[in-house]
Structure formats: structure tokens, C-alpha cells
């Protein structure tokens, strides 16, 4: 991981579909016509009628979260309790003895006294929000805005309240079906448009819009390329940089000021990258930056400002800011000099309904005002919904904030802000931010902020299912709470980057986060870090952190979207009683110390359930990851490539990482519960090998009180054939065995007696060597068990085992990495895999080759000894890998029915709770904000000694738990 929480502040100007610039910073370590515009007639632009219903003016394209998710061939998620609206905040207490003023956009008059909701003869409500600036508003006063009223101006408060006597601006206390609203949009009627050419229409618009909205679909600013223009990357909006950028310092930033374009940039006839052209570039996984282009020589773009970091070849960029880029449905362009707006309607039809152009920069402006309460209003179609930066004690409650070109709520440099029970949807940038540089210059983060019970949807991204509809744009977090703050009971659905981000001293609890990391990654649903952090992260549910491949180099793509992410130097953080499902890594601790990860439920995370990653030794020469406690967690993998623990360091050992105990593993889809790697090599561990071991992750015996399903007395498969490897016993010679190395001298292969019986000892020659088994056939989709006796020249020597095609491209044909570490002492090693291709010499065509087992890349001059290589077909128990998670995101217990009742009713009686191995009784009570992980167990394959071989096929009952055995259930015996 490269991102490092708030250690370095880097400014970046972003600009999304709305087209206006809005600086944002964050963690660092992360074909159409070129016709020129011509004047059009002067159609009328009119504001929306008053009053207007408080409803969004764009299509709400975000689809509901599905109640059921398929996470694998035998794994699923059942999800309930996700709210579709926030709970109402409790009623405000009476506000002292202050005055009450009234506003009504339809019946009011600024000449009135403003002291009654209706009246005549000078008594009655005011009409405009601007009238408040001369109202003499003071502490303890209340301003009541009439239901159904709509204003097209910014609400500004001219005074501050006090802690005991705030100023309150609210809807009427009861009976308000349509909230009073601030609408920053100018509506363009169908008659406002004239045809420019083809599907493109134009209208007069003096002010450059922040965004366009229409009921017929989604608008984005005109751009190049379009999604699908690049055949090699059909789902991406990006072109690819042809070479690394230069390294230059400009305006205090060291990055690239020149970008090398490639053959994929093809401009239409007559098109140019002239004045006004902008470029948006994905600098690395976690940054999408933007700059104006000062020149283009046909091969290089020269930028007005340096990128945040130097750029590398293959990363993506896209272009904006020219009329010729308007070449597809749902795009728009504004010519500021001609005051003309051009648009291709989202449905490709002539304009038949109004289009809304957002032109108001801010909905509610409370900056630098203290103890003001906003309650029950609506804000839509503006740049920033509510700007309260620099304030103290401001409360934002029960407010609907929708369709924002930029931030939903700017709470930078606030103290004691309370943001509660609001609904914030479709914000171009972050929904709620306490980040001190959200608007550019750093002014300080929020402190002692409370963000509670809000519903946030589509923060920094616009989604339809898993499809990103908006243009890539840099955001930071759907909710950023600053320091010594709290985020509780919030729901976040879809975030361009992080779901909830916090600094030190925070409590992050009872939140539900779905679909983080949709535009940028190196990311988490919940993210924090830093020394002396001491935050509490508890009872949260994080699901489906996506990761973002678009804009990454095609040849080296990968995502890093975590559930809960403790980044650089994270210290003293407690991560307890959370659920993480379907992230790349459930919990990632990066260079963290003295953190506690306890009682979490980690299910179906794609790479690992817990990743502890060490790549720094700034504080300790042996590495900065130390003293962590990992205990009483449930870790359930559902993919054969996934791990329970992933423990990695650049240094000599992971032994100082911490202490592991009482963890429970569902280890049937993947038998590898832990994998550790260091500069000395790597090793995979089954649960039997992991339990009680030392040296990987800890100096103490690991998970001595832990549990793995593999040791529950049942096996996952039965042996269904004999050994496929000929001459595996080496009884009389080494026929069929081969070696290879590229550089003389050749390696030496000797058959000799050894403690394993007859063995082969291979010493690699002048270059890395390969030892190959006799040939055999494999069938795609079938499962096999490989076991072998090994001894190596050095302890913890890396043994790259590969089952591959014995010709053509020599491709691997196993569904997982089979490599392991072995020692000087003889030992037996055993593992199972599924064949990914049919390889059979009796067939014709590409499949008509043989398979073989290689020990690949044996280091020059090093030796390895091998005996008793065995490969047998196995038949998995059809229920062995079946599991599920039943998640309750709600605030009350859930009585859940069996999720398999409709499709596999017989399965319901064979399900057990991973938490205690007890059978499930339906309906199942799932506590609030919690999850139950279930697994299926068939009783037909008992395995009394837990060696993976069914009792009926086991020739060696009573094998030592954790020891590898052969297909007969026998562990290594010295001869």
C-alpha cells in the first residue's frame, strides 16, 4: 500500500461531469463534429415554478442493493435491513424566548414584518432569503420556511447563536409534506432549444452550468474518448499514456507536466486540443488529477500544473473542454464566450421535457457562523449543498440534499458540528467532509464532529448497479469526520473512494457501507491510520468494496479495495465486532502496531480475510508491524485462491506481527488458512500446520485455541482413483523423470536411498533448473490431490511446484498456486487443486499434450530431494464448500428464513453456525448490525483423525493432527 493517511497534504483540482473546478485532497502514499458554434435564437430560460415539489430533477439511476449476492459457486450473501431513508432526528427543544420569523416564496413580501406565517397590511412572511441579511437575526431566534416554497438563491445566515440559544432555520414543526427547498437549477424548456446539427441542440445560457440534469437520463460533460472507443478496454473512459511522463516541479508540486499520447488518440477531422482543453489523468490507483492543457504537439500534452506524482506509461487519461467532444447521447458542452449551451439528450430524442442547468454555487452558506440549526429543509441542483466551514456548534438535521456538482456538506475546520438524519444523494464530490483542504488551501480538519444516522448514496460517483455512469473524478470519502469525532448509524451506498474516513481519537460504529472504491482504489470502506490513533471501529457492516480497474495499465491490473483499512503507523486502534464481506481484503493493517482485531466476521473476501502488510522500518529496524492482537474472529474463504491470513514483510520475519488466538476458520473452499512471506521466502499453512506454530506472525504459538472446519471430524472429499504419476516409487530407475536448465553446466540428477525410501536428488546447474515428473493426463474441472516427500538444501527453501502442460506454452493447469517452503528435514506435503484445462495425449488439437508436475526455478547450485510423488483424482463432497452469510444491517434483530429454502430446501437442515458449530434452527435470529456465517455439513465422510482422508479409505488411523498425509492417510515415515 502506498496511501498514507494525512501524512502529506497534496492539493489536486478535480472537475467532474459538471465541469467546474473544485479542489480536493486526500491520502498520499495514491468522435464528433468540430463545427464551431453559431448564434442561436434567444429562447427564454425560466426558473422552476413556485412552489415546486421537493424532488430530484434527474433520474435516480442508482439501483437498489440486491437482497441476495452470489459470491462463488457455493457461497452466497443474504442481506436485509438496509434503510432506504434515514430515521428522523428527535424534535428540537423550545428555543428560549427568541423571535420567530417566517418566509414564503409564493405569498411573502420583503416589505412585510416577517413575524407571521400569513397576514396583510404589512404583517406577514418575507419572500426572499436575501431579506434575512437585514433582519437583525440574533441568538434564540427562529426562522420558519413555508412548506412547498422554493428559492433559487443561497440561504445565508447573518448572525451566530450561542450554545444555549442557537439560531434555528426550519420547516414548520408539523404537517410539511413538501419541504421548503433551495433549488439552484435554471430550467430550459423544450422551446429554449434549437437544432445545432444532427442530435445536438443548443440554447442560450449566460452562466456556465455546474452540471445538467434531465428526467430522460444522465448527462456528463463532453469528453474524449467515450466508453467503448478503445477496443482493448471497452468499459473504460480512458486512453493510455504511451510513455512515462517527465519529472518536474511546478507551483511547489513535483510530478509530470508533459504526458505522452499514443496511437489510441485519434482526433476527428477538424478537431484540435485548443484553449480550454483539460485533461484528467489517473496518476496511480488512488489519484485522478486534472489540469488545463497549454499545448499539444501531436505527441505530447503540456499541462498548466504538474500532476500530484510523476505519471507512468499505461495509466489512463481523458480529455474535456471542446465542442467536438460532444459526440454521444447524454453529453453537453458550454461555450462561455458565445454563452451557448450544447447538448445531446440522454435518450437521443429532440428536447421534449425540461432540462435543468445547475448554476447556483452554494445552497446554504453558514461559513464562520456559530450555533445555527438547519432542520427539515431541502437543497438540490447546486454546487455545494451546505457550506459550514469554520463554524462552531452548527447542526444540520432532517435535510434532503440532492444532485450536487461538488460537495454535499463542507464541514472543514468546524468544531462540535452535528450532522444528523440527513439524506444526501448524488454528490459529484464527497457527501460529508471535515477535510481541511476540501476547497483548496488547508484550513484545518473538523474536530469533535458528530455524523449520525445519515443516508448517503452515490458520493463522488453515479452508479447503476455495478456500472459507473459518471466520468472518473477524484474524491476522498463519502463521510470524513476529522479527529476526536464520531460516525454512527450512517448508511453509505456507493462511494468513488473511501466510505468513512477518520483521523485520530474517533468512534466509528454501527455504520453500513456498500460499494466503496468505485473510481479509485488502494482504498477501504472504513479507513484510518497514524500514530497514537486510538480509534474504536465497531459493529460496522462493510460489503462489496469494488476496486477500480479502469485507467490502470492493461498488462498489470489489479484492485486493492479493502473492507477496513488501518494504514501507515496505525496504532492503538480497536477493530471489533464488525462484518466485512466481498472486499479484496477484509481487514488490512499496513505497518500498524499495538492494534486489536477482535470478534469480527470476515466472509468471502476475495484475496484474504486479514492482511498484515509490512514494508517500512522507520521506527524499528526489523519492521514497524508489531504487537497486534488478532483474536476470536471468524474467517471464511469462499474461493480456492483466497486466504484466511496474509502476512507479508519486506524484511526478515513476520514473527513480531502480534498474537493470534481463538480464531475460527471455514477452510474448505481454500485449505490455506495462512500464508506468510518475508525476505527469506514464503510458506502456506493449512489449519493443522498453522495451529500452534511459531515464527510466522508471532513468536507465540498461533491459534492454539482456534478452530478449523478441516479438523471437525469430516473430510471434504473421497479418493476416486489411483496415482497418475508413473514410476513415482523409483523402484528400479528414474525413467520418465527429466531436468532442464539453460546455462552450462547442466544440473545433476541422482537416484539414491534416503529416509523417504528411494528418492531423486537434483542439484541445479549453471542456471535455475527444473525437475519434471513423468507425464499424465488431466481433465478440466476435476479435482486432484497431490502429495510428495521433500527435503531441501536449506531450511525454508522455496519450492515452486507447478502442474503444467508439458509443451506449447507450458501453462499452469491448476486453479491455485501450489508453491510451498520445505526444510532440510524430510517431510510430507499435501494439497488439493482443480484442473483448469484438459490435457490428454490421446486427444487431438491443443489438448493433445501431456501434463507434468515441475519443481520450477530451483536456484543455481542448490539441491532438492524428492520421493513418493503422488497425484490422485478426488471427488469433493458436494456440500463441503457450501456456505453463506446472513447479514442484518438494521437496528433491530432479524428473524431470518433459510436462504436456501426455495432452491435447496434439503440444505436448510444441514447448516451450522460458524461461531459455535451448532446446527441452525429456523427462523434464525440475527442480531442488529450483525451477521451469522453458516456452512453445510454432510455426515457421510467421517474423518476421525482429521487428516483429510475419509475413514473408509484411511490405512493409517490416528495420524498426527496437522501432518500432511498421502492418499492412504499415512504421514511421513522414515525408512
Walk through the language-model features, giving the residues of each:
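Extracellular polysaccharide-degrading/modifying enzymes targeting complex plant/algal/animal polysaccharides
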Residues: 61-389, 395, 410, 463, ...
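Extracellular carbohydrate recognition and processing domains
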Residues: 810-843
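Extra-cytoplasmic beta-strand recognition segments
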Residues: 728-731, 771-796, 829-839, 867-869
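Glycine- and acidic/polar-rich repeat regions and solenoidal domains
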Residues: 384-387, 406-412, 425-695, 699-700
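Short carbohydrate-recognition loop motifs
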Residues: 745-768
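Extracellular calcium-associated, cysteine-rich motifs in secreted modular proteins
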Residues: 90-92, 97-98, 114, 939-975
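Extracellular carbohydrate-recognition regions
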Residues: 707-742
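C-terminal beta-strand-rich structural cap/linker in extracellular carbohydrate-active enzymes
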Residues: 921-940
Amino acid at each position: 500500500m502506498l496511501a498514507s493517511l494525512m501524512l502529506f497534504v497534496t492539493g489536486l483540482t478535480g472537475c467532474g461531469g459538471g465541469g467546474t473546478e473544485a479542489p480536493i485532497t486526500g491520502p498520499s502514499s495514491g468522435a464528433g463534429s468540430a463545427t464551431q458554434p453559431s448564434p442561436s435564437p434567444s429562447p427564454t430560460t425560466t426558473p422552476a415554478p413556485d412552489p415546486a415539489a421537493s424532488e430530484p430533477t434527474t433520474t435516480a439511476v442508482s439501483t437498489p442493493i440486491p437482497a441476495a449476492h452470489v459470491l462463488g459457486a457455493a457461497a452466497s450473501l443474504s442481506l436485509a435491513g438496509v434503510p432506504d431513508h434515514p430515521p428522523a432526528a428527535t424534535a428540537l427543544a423550545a428555543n428560549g424566548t427568541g423571535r420567530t420569523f417566517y418566509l414564503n416564496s409564493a405569498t411573502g413580501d420583503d416589505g412585510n414584518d416577517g413575524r407571521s406565517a400569513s397576514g396583510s397590511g404589512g404583517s406577514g412572511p418575507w419572500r426572499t432569503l436575501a431579506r434575512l441579511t437585514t433582519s437583525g437575526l440574533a441568538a434564540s431566534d427562529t426562522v420558519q420556511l413555508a412548506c412547498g416554497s422554493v428559492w433559487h438563491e443561497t440561504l445565508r445566515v447573518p448572525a451566530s447563536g450561542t450554545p444555549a440559544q442557537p439560531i434555528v432555520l426550519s420547516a414548520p414543526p408539523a404537517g410539511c409534506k413538501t419541504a421548503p427547498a433551495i433549488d439552484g437549477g435554471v430550467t430550459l424548456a423544450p422551446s429554449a432549444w434549437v437544432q445545432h446539427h444532427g442530435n445536438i441542440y443548443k440554447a442560450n445560457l449566460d452562466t456556465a452550468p455546474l452540471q445538467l440534469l434531465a428526467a430522460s437520463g444522465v448527462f456528463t460533460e463532453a469528453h474524449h474518448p467515450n466508453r467503448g472507443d478503445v477496443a482493448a478496454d471497452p468499459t473504460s473512459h480512458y486512453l493510455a499514456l504511451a510513455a512515462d511522463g517527465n519529472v518536474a516541479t511546478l507551483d511547489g508540486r513535483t510530478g509530470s507536466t508533459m504526458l505522452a499520447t499514443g496511437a489510441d488518440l485519434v482526433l476527428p477531422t477538424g478537431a484540435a486540443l485548443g484553449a480550454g482543453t483539460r485533461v484528467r489523468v489517473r496518476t496511480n490507483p488512488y489519484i485522478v488529477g486534472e489540469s488545463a492543457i497549454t499545448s499539444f504537439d501531436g505527441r505530447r500534452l503540456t499541462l498548466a500544473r504538474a500532476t500530484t506524482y510523476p505519471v507512468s506509461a499505461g495509466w489512463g487519461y481523458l480529455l474535456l473542454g471542446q465542442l467536438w467532444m460532444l459526440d454521444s447521447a447524454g453529453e453537453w458542452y458550454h461555450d462561455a464566450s458565445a454563452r451557448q449551451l450544447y447538448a445531446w439528450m440522454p435518450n437521443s430524442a429532440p428536447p421534449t421535457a425540461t432540462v435543468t442547468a445547475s448554476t447556483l454555487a452554494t445552497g446554504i452558506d453558514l461559513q464562520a457562523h456559530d450555533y445555527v440549526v438547519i432542520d427539515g429543509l431541502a437543497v438540490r441542483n447546486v454546487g455545494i449543498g451546505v457550506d459550514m466551514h469554520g463554524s462552531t456548534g452548527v447542526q444540520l438535521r432532517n435535510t434532503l440534499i440532492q444532485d450536487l456538482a461538488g460537495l454535499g456538506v463542507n464541514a472543514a475546520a468546524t468544531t462540535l458540528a452535528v450532522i444528523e438524519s440527513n439524506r444526501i444523494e448524488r454528490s459529484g464530490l464527497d457527501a460529508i467532509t471535515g477535510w481541511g483542504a476540501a476547497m483548496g488551501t488547508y484550513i484545518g480538519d473538523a474536530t469533535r464532529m458528530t455524523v449520525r444516522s445519515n443516508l448517503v448514496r452515490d458520493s463522488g460517483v453515479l452508479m447503476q448497479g455495478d456500472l459507473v455512469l459518471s466520468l472518473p473524478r477524484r474524491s476522498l470519502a463519502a463521510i470524513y469526520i476529522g479527529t476526536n469525532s464520531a460516525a454512527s448509524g450512517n448508511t453509505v451506498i456507493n462511494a468513488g473512494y473511501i466510505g468513512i474516513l477518520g483521523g485520530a481519537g474517533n468512534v466509528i460504529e454501527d455504520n453500513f457501507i456498500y460499494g466503496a472504491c468505485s473510481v479509485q482504489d488502494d482504498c477501504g470502506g472504513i479507513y484510518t491510520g497514524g500514530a497514537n490513533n486510538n480509534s474504536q471501529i465497531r459493529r460496522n457492516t462493510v460489503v462489496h468494496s469494488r476496486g477500480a480497474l479502469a485507467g490502470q495499465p492493461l498488462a498489470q491490473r489489479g484492485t486493492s479495495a479493502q473492507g477496513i483499512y488501518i494504514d501507515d503507523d496505525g496504532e492503538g486502534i480497536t477493530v471489533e465486532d464488525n462484518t466485512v464481506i466481498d472486499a479484496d481484503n477484509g481487514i488490512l493493517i499496513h505497518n500498524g502496531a499495538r492494534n486489536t482485531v477482535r470478534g469480527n466476521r470476515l466472509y468471502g473476501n476475495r484475496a484474504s480475510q486479514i492482511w498484515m502488510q509490512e514494508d517500512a522500518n522507520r521506527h524499528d529496524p526489523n519492521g514497524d508491524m508489531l504487537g497486534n492482537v488478532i483474536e476470536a474472529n471468524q474467517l471464511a474463504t469462499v474461493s480456492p485462491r483466497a486466504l484466511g491470513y496474509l502476512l507479508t514483510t519486506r524484511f526478515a520475519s513476520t514473527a513480531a506481527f502480534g498474537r493470534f488466538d481463538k480464531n475460527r476458520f471455514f477452510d474448505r473452499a481454500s485449505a490455506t488458512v495462512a500464508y506468510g512471506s518475508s525476505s527469506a521466502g514464503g510458506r502456506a499453512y493449512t489449519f493443522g500446520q498453522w495451529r500452534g506454530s511459531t515464527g510466522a506472525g508471532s513468536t507465540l504459538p498461533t491459534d492454539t485455541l482456534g478452530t478449523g472446519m478441516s479438523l471437525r471430524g469430516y473430510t471434504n472429499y473421497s479418493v476416486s482413483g489411483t496415482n497418475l504419476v508413473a514410476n513415482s516409487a523409483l523402484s528400479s530407475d528414474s525413467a520418465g523423470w527429466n531436468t532442464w536448465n539453460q546455462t552450462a553446466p547442466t544440473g545433476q540428477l541422482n537416484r539414491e536411498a534416503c529416509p523417504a525410501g528411494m528418492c531423486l536428488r537434483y542439484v541445479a546447474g549453471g542456471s535455475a533448473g527444473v525437475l519434471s515428473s513423468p507425464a499424465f493426463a488431466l481433465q478440466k474441472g476435476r479435482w486432484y490431490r497431490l502429495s510428495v516427500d521433500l527435503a531441501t538444501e536449506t531450511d525454508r527453501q522455496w519450492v515452486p511446484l507447478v502442474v503444467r502442460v508439458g509443451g506449447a506454452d507450458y501453462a499452469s493447469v491448476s486453479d491455485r498456486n501450489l508453491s510451498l517452503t520445505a526444510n532440510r528435514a524430510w517431510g510430507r506435503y499435501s494439497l488439493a487443486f482443480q484442473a483448469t484445462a484438459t490435457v490428454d495425449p490421446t486427444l487431438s488439437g491443443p489438448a493433445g499434450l501431456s501434463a507434468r508436475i515441475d519443481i520450477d526455478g530451483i536456484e543455481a547450485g542448490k539441491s532438492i530431494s524428492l520421493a513418493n510423488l503422488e497425484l490422485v483424482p478426488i471427488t469433493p463432497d458436494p456440500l463441503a464448500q457450501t456456505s453463506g452469510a446472513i447479514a442484518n444491517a438494521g437496528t433491530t434483530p432479524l428473524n431470518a428464513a433459510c436462504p436456501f429454502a426455495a432452491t435447496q430446501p434439503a440444505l436448510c437442515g444441514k447448516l451450522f453456525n460458524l461461531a459455535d458449530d451448532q446446527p441452525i434452527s429456523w427462523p434464525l435470529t440475527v442480531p442488529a448490525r450483525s451477521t451469522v456465517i453458516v456452512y453445510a455439513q454432510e455426515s457421510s465422510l467421517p474423518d476421525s483423525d482429521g487428516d483429510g482422508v475419509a475413514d473408509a479409505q484411511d490405512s493409517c488411523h490416528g495420524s498426527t493432527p496437522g501432518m500432511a498425509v498421502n492418499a492412504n492417510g499415512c504421514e511421513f515415515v522414515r525408512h
